[in-house]
Amino acid sequence: MTKRVYRFKEGNAEMKEILGGKGANLAEMTRLGLPVPDGFTISTEACMDYLNNGHSFTTELKKEIEKYLEQLEVSSGKSFDDPENIMLLSVRSGAKFSMPGMMDTVLNLGLNDENVEHLAKITNDEAFAYDCYRRLLKNFCVVFFCFYK
């Protein structure tokens, strides 16, 4: 099976063809020991497979992503299933070349109606928590349902 997902610590700046610019730069910052949250990049090849497969993930890619999500839960000590210890993700698209403002981003993936209340409690800032949730919903709709910004 061809590797399609790379943890940040598995890459470097020379891997822009495989990881895209953002992915390669995150990998390089991790390699240099800079404070980068643990994460992973889905390869450009996997993205091409997705596009060529009728906008559908293969079973193998789904399993690989699930494996990396489980590793993130372990390394972060957080979980999508634990409202007391919420794992929130940033999902960013990237390309080989920098295109500021052209690529999609979804922040705070993992927030929902139940755990946003806990985020408000642990941050002691209800407005902040609900603003994060509002941004998630807005960006999710823009990116996945083609709503206008």
Specify the residue positions occupied by each region the protein language model found.
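Nucleotide/phosphate-binding sheet-loop regions of phosphoryl- and nucleotidyl-transfer enzymes
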Residues: M1-K149
